[in-house]
Regions:
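Buried, small/hydrophobic-residue-enriched core segments of structured protein domains
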Residues: 1-175, 195-197
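Acidic, Ser/Thr-rich peripheral helices and adjacent loops at domain boundaries
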Residues: 90-110, 232-254
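Glycine-rich beta-to-alpha transition loops that act as phosphate-gripper elements at the mouths
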Residues: 187-195, 219-223
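An anionic, glycine-rich sequence signature occurring as long contiguous blocks
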Residues: 239-282
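Extended hydrophobic packing segments that form well-structured cores
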Residues: 264-317
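Short beta-strand/loop segments at the ligand-binding rim of alpha/beta enzyme cores
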Residues: 171, 180-187, 214
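Glycine-rich phosphate-binding active-site loops on the catalytic face of alpha/beta enzymes
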Residues: 208-235
Length: 317
């Protein structure tokens, strides 16, 4: 299994300018040289998760299908239910006409905007609906106007990971008739999984005709007692590496959740007059040495020895 610091290091080592090409080359190396067989999990949301699924996985399909083992796709950000199962669209097939289905969608849509659009399902076909609202002098809705109705093809984000993987790699059906991904591929999700979310995911997969065994959950502290490293705001992260004398920034910047952006490259920590600290990202080697950070370990050697008592005293200052 891989995690973000090692993964982003590999991506930027192969191609720091073109992240998609760098990730393609890095993953190909992992699949063919490092882990040519067996169970292999890869975190795929470091930069562009949906771009990874849409462009990189199809390119590596033959390699994945020829491996003696299972390749596991791992997203780690975004709306967990939508990432796994895709978006949920309301079926208005009970309406007598497509136009009345569009109006029903407008009535159900909760918004203060005068123009909005959305996607509905009608008679096994998806449609994109564009609506305008007319209002009276009091600002209350007077009427809905259907501007456009166009046939709509679901995007990769609309379908979600499981359906998209099935489209690419195919699969079989269980004895109960549910779709099961090919044995060479599956997915895992372990970020913020609760019992309630797990149940919602299984229900959505059931509605779409997919077996629950297409996804594995990583269940840890959040599910058990909702205490994690984030409870104290503490984590240890790699932000920079030197490979063949080359400085390589290590950072993630997932499109699926900008709040998970990490620190990048060499860091300079500045102590302000009020005692607070400011961190500067991706600085030069010279700038990094001017900050408050002090080397503790280097090349396997302990450079600064402190007792726990000294560390506790520093924390409480």
């Amino acid at each position: 299994a891989g995690e973000h610091s090692v993964t982003t290091l590999g991506i930027n080592y192969y191609n720091a300018e073109d992240k998609q090409q760098g990730e393609l080359e890095y993953l190909k190396w992992l699949l063919t040289e490092v882990q040519p067989s067996g169970l292999f999990s890869y975190v795929a949301d470091s930069y562009d998760y949906w771009g990874f699924l849409e462009h990189i996985l199809p390119t590596l399909k033959d390699i994945i299908m020829s491996r003696d083992g299972k390749y596991v796709v791992r997203p780690d950000s975004g709306n967990v239910i939508d990432v796994i199962c895709g978006k949920e669209f309301i079926d208005y097939s009970e309406e007598p006409t497509l136009h009345s289905a569009a109006l029903r969608f407008a009535y159900d849509y909760e918004t203060q905007e005068n123009n909005f659009e959305g996607v509905i399902l009608y008679q096994k076909q998806y449609y994109k609906i564009s609506i305008s609202v007319t209002r009276n002098k009091l600002g209350l809705i007077d009427n809905y106007i259907v501007n456009r109705i166009d046939e709509y093809d679901l995007t990769i984000e609309d379908k979600g990971t499981v359906e998209w993987l099935y489209d690419i790699f195919g699969g079989t059906k269980t004895e109960q008739g549910y779709k099961l991904l090919d044995s060479h591929i599956c997915m895992i999700y372990g970020d913020g999984i609760t019992y309630e979310r797990a149940e919602q995911i299984f229900n959505r997969l059931h509605e779409k005709g997919f077996a629950s065994t297409n996804v594995v959950f990583g269940i840890g502290s959040w599910t058990m007692n909702q205490v994690s490293r984030d409870s104290l705001g503490i984590a240890v992260k790699a932000t920079n590496a030197i490979v063949n004398d080359k400085q390589i920034p290590i950072y993630k910047q997932p499109k699926t959740d900008s709040t998970k952006n990490s620190a990048k490259g060499l860091l300079k920590v500045i102590k302000n007059e009020d005692g607070s600290y400011t961190t500067l990202n991706n600085v030069t080697v010279e700038e990094e040495q001017q900050g408050e950070l002090v080397s503790v370990f280097k090349d396997g050697k302990l450079l600064r020895e402190q007792t726990f008592e000294e560390i506790r005293n520093l924390i409480w200052k």
